[in-house]
Amino acid sequence: HDIDKNKQETRPMKRNAVLVDGVVLNGPIIDSSSGEKFVEDVYRILMNELVYKASDINQKVCEWQEPEQLKKLLDLNIKDNGEPHEKLLQLCKNVIKYSVKTSHPRFFNQLYAGMDHYSLAARFITEALNPSVYTYEVSPVFILTEEAILKKMIEFLGWKEGDGIFSPGGSVSNMYAVNLARYKYCPDIKQKGLSSAPRLVMFTSEECHYSMKKAAAFLGIGTENVYFVKTDDRGKMIPEELENQIQRAKKEGAVPFLVSATSGTTVLGAFDPLDDIANICEKHKLWFHVDASWGGSALMSQKYRKRLHGIHRADSVAWNPHKMLMAGIQCCALLVRDNSGLLKRCHSAEATYLFQQDKFYDVQYDTGDKSIQCSRRADAFKFWMMWKALGTTGLEERINRALALTRYLASEIKKRDGFELLWEPEYANTCFWYIPPSFRNMEKGPEYWRKFSNVAPTIKERMMKKGSMMVGYQPHRDKVNFFRHIVISPQVSREDMDFVLDEIERLGRDL
């Protein structure tokens, strides 16, 4: 009877429906109850399949499938009509099953790994709120948390004041730095374009991240105007070579404007001598940028911050908390020593629909005109939440543990037959060869190195198809393919280090 009564009560609404272009506008058309149920069910799957299993070494790191087979397993086709609830849930389970578990204790493949639960919870919040961080009126909480975390990061650089912005990746942070340096020396270029500037040259090391070359291409500087400075056998920029390159550019009639040093190179984990480079930059009045995307987190360790001695003299720094600090991709900051508003002057477009100057609050909190983006994620919030939860001490312990495990692995490599450590690790990068028994008595000529270069790729293929772990490899200079092992996650133990060496030996001894 009640149901019939409710039906009768809804009939007048249907009779009085408002239509525009044949579309009924009365009431929402989204079925909130089914959507809410889907979110609840997916959340349960996430907890059971990812969060609870994140540190379970009995789980596979990956469930390898060839691309064509994976396309069939995932049913990637989009149809005119939506799929049913249960099929969507199965799809979610398959996405998890066939994705790489980067939170697994034996994922050593990249410069990110592990799962920080506080950061993850913060990401749940920001994904649900779907904010865009450009004005205080639409993102009050996230504007303030970004400001707070930037101030703290600036403090760790040793600056009394500064500015900054969170960007979508260390590559973009490096591009910001190049653009700021160019604007400082050639401010007319913003309005008049490249024709108003002389031939500009920037300098970086042979071991730099490839984003420096991309920045030159993207900003119209040109890749031929990136002068790569020689490094020593540990991968560190040689200051004398930098001086030579600057003199060379000047003799060519070019205008040097920026030097980019690296604190934590991608392959070797090397740290450039920042103080010596800063001296040269001051001598020639060049912008000094430090790409500390990987190594910047060492600043939080009293024991290891000396790796970045001299960083306080930089004009700008790129630092990615999503790497060693596990804040979750993406979480990347560009920090600038200038506090005069250079970031805003360089990038502002003064969009009047966003950045009205007669708002009812302090418009200094509207940070969007500092950014090259309009819509921008609340990436700082997850780092803020994690830092609040763990404190500086907790983050320092993570770094110290990761580097202690790295030293342990290096020491074990030196003890084992068939393993060769290529460089003593300076950070969390351990580079080594595994030499199968059949190679150990061979003469090391061209044929040896040709065959030996296939060892690491073959072992990598086997570990991926087995799903036991992931460790990266690459050639470097005169060295053929070798393993590059990265330690980050606090879930990693000494037993995992032993497992890596045992597993490589198991997978490669027959080669």
Swiss-Prot record:
BP terms from Gene Ontology: carboxylic acid metabolic process
EC number(s) reported in the record: 4.1.1.11, 4.1.1.29
Signal sequence segment: none
Keyword tags: Decarboxylase, Lyase, Pyridoxal phosphate
UniProt keyword annotation of Iron present: no
Cited function: Catalyzes the decarboxylation of L-aspartate, 3-sulfino-L-alanine (cysteine sulfinic acid), and L-cysteate to beta-alanine, hypotaurine and taurine, respectively. The preferred substrate is L-aspartate. Does not exhibit any decarboxylation activity toward glutamate.
Family per similarity comment: Belongs to the group II decarboxylase family.
PANTHER family: ACIDIC AMINO ACID DECARBOXYLASE GADL1 (PTHR45677:SF1), GLUTAMATE DECARBOXYLASE-RELATED (PTHR45677)
Gene name for this UniProt entry: gadl1
Subunit-level organization: Homodimer.
Coiled coil: none
Reactions catalysed according to its record: L-aspartate + H(+) = beta-alanine + CO2; 3-sulfino-L-alanine + H(+) = hypotaurine + CO2
Top-level class of the enzyme under EC nomenclature: lyase
Name of the protein in its database record: Acidic amino acid decarboxylase GADL1
Source organism of the structure: Xenopus tropicalis (Western clawed frog)
GO terms for MF: aspartate 1-decarboxylase activity; pyridoxal phosphate binding; sulfinoalanine decarboxylase activity
